[in-house]
Amino acid sequence: MDDSREESQFIVDDVSKTIKEAIETTIGGNAYQHDKVNNWTGQVVENCLTVLTKEQKPYKYIVTAMIMQKNGAGLHTASSCYWNNDTDGSCTVRWENKTMYCIVSVFGLAV
């Protein structure tokens, strides 16, 4: 594969690492606090976007984040995309600590 094409691909492992770092930096070892969730989710998505756009890859990004208290409730989600499997991609990370779950999805759409 050509190096320039490799450099511009959506690499799931790299995106996953970016997401995990954004979550750890923002939430880390904090306990769930309802009044901070809105701020945390905003910071997580902004941190992800900042890192991803600094890479200057030819993508438009969509980032979603959800924080949920661990209280035994269930959660089911789904997403569907119509895109080019050769150039576009997605990555979802589920992170948790003792009191909460954080689920972040990044969709990369080639320009």
From Swiss-Prot:
Localization annotation: Cytoplasm, Cytoskeleton
GO biological process assignments: determination of adult lifespan; microtubule-based movement; mitotic cell cycle; retrograde axonal transport; spermatid development
Primary residence: cytoplasm
Phenotypic effect of disruption: Male sterility.
Annotated Gene Ontology cellular component terms: axon cytoplasm; cytoplasm; cytoplasmic dynein complex; dynein complex; microtubule; protein-containing complex
Family matches, as InterPro entries: Tctex-1-like, Tctex-1-like_sf
Disulfide bridges in this chain: none
Pfam families with a match to the protein in the record: Tctex-1
Alphabetized UniProt keyword annotations: Cytoplasm, Cytoskeleton, Dynein, Microtubule, Motor protein
Gene Ontology molecular functions: disordered domain specific binding; dynein intermediate chain binding; dynein light intermediate chain binding; identical protein binding; protein homodimerization activity
Family label: Belongs to the dynein light chain Tctex-type family.
Listed PANTHER family: DYNEIN LIGHT CHAIN TCTEX-TYPE (PTHR21255:SF4), T-COMPLEX-ASSOCIATED-TESTIS-EXPRESSED 1/ DYNEIN LIGHT CHAIN (PTHR21255)
Function according to Swiss-Prot or TrEMBL: Acts as one of several non-catalytic accessory components of the cytoplasmic dynein complex that are thought to be involved in linking dynein to cargos and to adapter proteins that regulate dynein function. Cytoplasmic dynein acts as a motor for the intracellular retrograde motility of vesicles and organelles along microtubules. Required for spermatid differentiation. Is not required for polarized transport in rhabdomere development and appears to be a non-essential component of the cytoplasmic dynein complex.
Description of how the protein assembles with itself and partners: The cytoplasmic dynein complex consists of two catalytic heavy chains (HCs) and a number of non-catalytic subunits presented by intermediate chains (ICs), light intermediate chains (LICs) and light chains (LCs).
Protein name: Dynein light chain Tctex-type
Natural source organism: Drosophila melanogaster
